[in-house]
Each structure stands twice: as structure tokens, then as C-alpha cells.
């Protein structure tokens, strides 16, 4: 429903094309073909491999196909029915497929887990690639050394933390810092008119997201509820830790420690990706299905779905209400508008 209404999608690469669909510059078949091309590779390589190797549902397997379904569907009811069918199909087929693969003489599930390792590492490199793409090799080399240093510190002194989540956070902070420094340096020569025009554009786009707030809040509630049911892992930095926490035979104390470790890794990843998600939302008027992904953290730490659902709805609502203030702050640093799409590219 969210993707059909162009209110929110999971894939950041799809969000910039949805305004073209809303404004009538593109039909659903064209937009759907783009969405399919951008998403199908992640579904096959990340979504399926993560789920089969951990036994947990994940965002890529659930939300990327529903992005495609919603964009292609000709009406709301068709989008709702097909999306529901996909969710039921994925949920009911997970256990039989897992049993089939474990019965084979070859360890396919272990191989799929190894296949996903480079994907996890690649996510951590996104900010560094963005710095190189936007600001050149000198800044990217310095940033790479700082990110490497942060990884060494985490591995050496904080082995309970997921190093890739810290790498993403440090990399995005460096990306933000370099962009803000560039704006402050160039502010004296920049015309003030450009700075004033950005907030007005953000205000218009933010209002479109706020108009879809009830549906987005319901989605946030459902995501948090599912994340609390021990069948779902939100992202690459938490899903394998969650699989260990939910494994049979583990003590409650060890499970709680792993859950908090997964929640912390997810929280750090969410902080790192706030600039990308927020600026894309403000520029397009299309939000992310899971928001800043803090609804995952709420679900991991909630003792029951009944507590997770209202908490998730509140969290994603607060995120949307804060978008207006984030837009005003970002309007002071126009360079961030050009920097934030670089990780997505």
C-alpha cells in the first residue's frame, strides 16, 4: 500500500523515481520495470541468502518485492492483496525450504552464509565510496584510515560489538563532517538566496509525508511487532547476532546479551544512515518503509508484540515529525544535498 501510494518504499534507489510517477511523467509499467531492475539482485543475493542461512525473515526479502508489487499494481486493492500473498508465501515456505536444504548431503546453508559475508562488508564501505565520489581521493584516504582505526579499536577492545555497524557510523559521520566543512568554507562566496530556497522545498515534501503518517505509523507498528516475535532480522548488522540469540539451547542470559548487542549494532547503523534517509525523504516526499530503522531496535528489545507495536508507531511518528526540523538544519548546508545521494549511487 505504501509503495502504491508513493508514500514509502524500502529501496532508497526507488524513492527518487516515485515523484515522476506521482506527477504523471512516468507510468506504472515504466516505474515498475525500474524498481524490478534495482531490487531483484538484492532479493536474490541478500534477501534469500540471509534468510536461508539464519532462518529469519529480513527486510530485503519482504520489502523489496512489495516495493515492486506496489509500484506495478493498478489499484489499491490489488496492491494490498498481492502484498499480503507475498508475505504469507514467504512466511509459510521458510521452514519447508530450510528443512529441505538441511537434509541435503552438502552444506548449502553454510555456503549461503559465506556468500553473504562480502555483502555485509560492502555495506560498511558505502560512506568511503561516497567520500571518494564527492570529495576526491585525499579525503577518502584519510577517512579510510580513520574507519580502519575504528574497526581495530572495536575488534581489540569491544569484541561484543559488530564492527561493520561502527564502520558505517564513523564513515557517515566523516561524510557529514567533510560536507559541512566544505559548506562553511564556501559560505562567504555563496549567495544567500540558494540557502533560503531549500527549506521551502523541504516543507512541501515533508507535508506530503505527514499526510501519509497514519499508514506509515501502522507499518512501523507492524515491523516492530514482527521484530519482537523472533522471526525477523532487520539488517545485515543484526541478523546473524539475532540468529545466535534465538538458537535453541542458548541460556536466557546469553540470549539477552546477544539481543542487546544486536540492538546496539542496529542503533549505530540507524544513526549513520539518518542523513541519507532524511535528505532523500525531504527531496522526494517519499519516506522509508522502516523509517530510520529504529523500529527494528524497538522490536528487538520489546518483550512482546503488544508492547512493540505501539512503541514502533510512536518512534516512526516522531521521526516524521522531526523531518521538518531536520530539513531546516540541512537547508543551512546545501552541500549535504549533493552528498547524501552518493551512498545510494
Label every model-predicted segment.
Residues 1, 168-283:
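Membrane-embedded hairpin module used as a gating/binding unit in multi-pass transport
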Residues 1-49, 69-70:
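N-terminal signal-anchor module of multipass membrane proteins
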Residues 6-21, 104-115, 198, 202-206, ...:
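Hydrophobic alpha-helical segments of integral membrane proteins
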Residues 48-58, 109-121, 262-266:
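Structural signature of hydrophobic alpha-helical transmembrane segments
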Residues 80-89, 141-150, 289-298, 336-337:
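Central hydrophobic cores of alpha-helical transmembrane segments
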Residues 103-225:
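Conserved, well-structured core segments that form the ligand-binding/active-site neighborhood
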Residues 233-236, 266-329:
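Conserved mixed alpha/beta catalytic, RNA-binding, or beta-rich assembly cores of soluble enzyme
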Residues 338-345:
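Conserved small/polar residues in nucleotide/adenosyl-binding loops
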Amino acid at each position: 500500500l505504501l509503495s502504491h501510494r508513493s508514500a514509502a518504499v524500502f529501496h532508497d534507489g526507488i524513492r527518487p523515481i516515485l515523484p515522476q510517477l506521482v506527477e504523471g511523467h512516468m507510468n506504472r509499467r515504466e516505474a515498475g520495470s525500474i524498481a524490478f531492475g534495482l531490487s531483484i539482485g538484492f532479493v536474490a543475493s541478500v534477501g534469500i541468502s540471509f534468510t536461508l542461512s539464519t532462518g529469519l525473515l529480513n527486510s530485503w526479502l519482504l520489502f523489496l518485492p512489495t516495493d515492486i508489487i506496489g509500484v506495478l499494481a493498478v489499484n489499491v486493492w490489488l496492491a494490498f492483496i498481492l502484498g499480503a500473498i507475498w508475505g504469507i508465501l514467504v512466511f509459510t515456505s521458510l521452514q519447508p525450504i530450510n528443512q529441505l536444504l538441511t537434509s541435503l548431503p552438502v552444506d548449502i546453508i553454510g555456503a549461503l552464509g559465506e556468500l553473504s559475508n562480502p555483502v555485509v562488508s560492502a555495506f560498511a564501505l558505502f560512506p568511503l565510496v561516497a567520500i571518494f565520489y564527492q570529495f576526491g581521493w585525499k579525503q577518502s584516504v584519510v577517512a579510510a584510515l580513520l574507519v580502519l582505526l575504528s574497526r581495530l579499536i572495536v575488534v581489540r577492545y569491544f569484541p561484543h560489538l559488530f564492527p561493520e555497524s561502527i564502520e558505517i557510523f564513523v564513515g557517515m559521520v566523516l561524510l557529514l563532517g567533510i560536507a559541512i566543512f566544505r559548506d562553511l568554507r564556501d559560505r562567504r562566496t555563496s549567495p544567500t538566496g540558494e540557502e533560503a530556497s531549500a527549506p521551502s522545498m523541504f516543507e512541501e515534501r515533508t507535508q506530503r509525508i505527514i499526510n501519509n503518517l497514519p499508514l506509515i505509523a501502522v507499518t512501523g507498528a507492524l515491523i516492530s511487532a514482527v521484530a519482537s516475535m523472533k522471526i525477523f532480522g532487520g539488517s545485515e548488522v543484526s541478523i546473524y547476532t539475532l540468529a545466535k540469540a534465538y538458537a535453541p539451547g542458548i541460556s536466557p542470559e546469553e540470549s539477552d546479551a546477544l539481543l542487546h548487542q544486536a540492538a546496539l549494532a542496529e542503533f549505530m547503523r540507524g544513526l549513520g544512515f539518518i542523513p541519507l534517509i532524511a535528505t532523500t525523504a525531504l527531496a522526494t516526499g517519499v519516506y522509508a518503509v522502516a523509517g530510520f530503522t529504529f523500529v527494528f531496535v524497538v522490536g528487538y528489545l520489546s518483550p512482546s508484540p503488544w508492547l512493540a507495536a505501539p512503541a514502533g508507531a510512536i518512534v516512526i511518528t516522531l521521526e516524521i515529525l522531526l523531518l521538518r526540523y531536520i530539513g531546516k538544519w540541512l537547508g543551512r548546508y546545501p552541500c549535504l544535498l549533493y552528498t547524501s545521494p552518493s551512498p545510494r549511487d
